């Protein structure tokens, strides 16, 4: 189970015209706590930002699953709200449960296509209620270091 945190980084960015401008960019980090999320985003951003930067905001993000893409054109992240439809055994009524997933794609049509591909093996019936582009710049899932050995 992943716990995702949306971290906002504020720094001075050199624009295309050569001027410096203060910008705030959101990133998504997989971490166990707010403290770890802050440490991870600082570690991930340090090589890419010259000069000072601050973590201006950290909040929990409610994503149940991620569908990343290796395609170069897929440079945007789309938030998709899915509604799973199940039958209640006792009453026989339909029960709807919503969940949010994140899909990396080139555009809206591509996001829906990749979402359907990712959900192909799902046994439950679902409906796509919403697909919208997010302002997320990048996503950093947790990966164990190769030299980290589990304690015995």
Regions found by a protein language model. Give the residues of each.
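Short aromatic-glycine-(Arg/Gly/Cys) micro-motifs in beta-strand/loop hairpins
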Residues: 1-22, 72-96
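Short, low-order "capping/linker" segments at domain edges
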Residues: 68-73, 140-152
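Extended, compositionally biased
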Residues: 52-79, 87
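Mixed-charge, glycine-accented linear interaction segment located at domain edges/termini
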Residues: 100-140
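A cross-kingdom feature marking solvent-exposed beta-strand/loop segments within repeated
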Residues: 12-30, 47-50, 93-101, 121-123, ...
């Amino acid at each position: 189970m992943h716990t995702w945190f949306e971290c906002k980084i504020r720094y001075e960015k050199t624009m295309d015209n050569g001027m410096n401008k203060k910008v705030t960019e959101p990133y998504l980090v997989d971490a166990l706590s707010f403290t770890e999320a802050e440490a991870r985003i600082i570690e991930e951003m340090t090589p890419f930002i010259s000069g000072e930067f601050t973590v201006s905001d950290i909040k929990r993000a409610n994503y149940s699953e991620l569908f990343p893409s290796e395609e170069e054109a897929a440079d945007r992240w789309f938030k998709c709200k899915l509604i799973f439809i199940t039958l209640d055994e006792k009453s026989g009524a339909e029960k709807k449960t919503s969940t949010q997933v994140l899909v990396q794609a080139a555009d809206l049509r591509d996001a829906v296509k990749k979402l359907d591909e990712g959900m192909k093996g799902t046994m439950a019936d679902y409906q796509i209620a919403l697909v919208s582009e997010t302002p997320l710049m990048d996503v950093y899932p947790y990966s164990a270091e190769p030299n980290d050995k589990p304690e015995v």
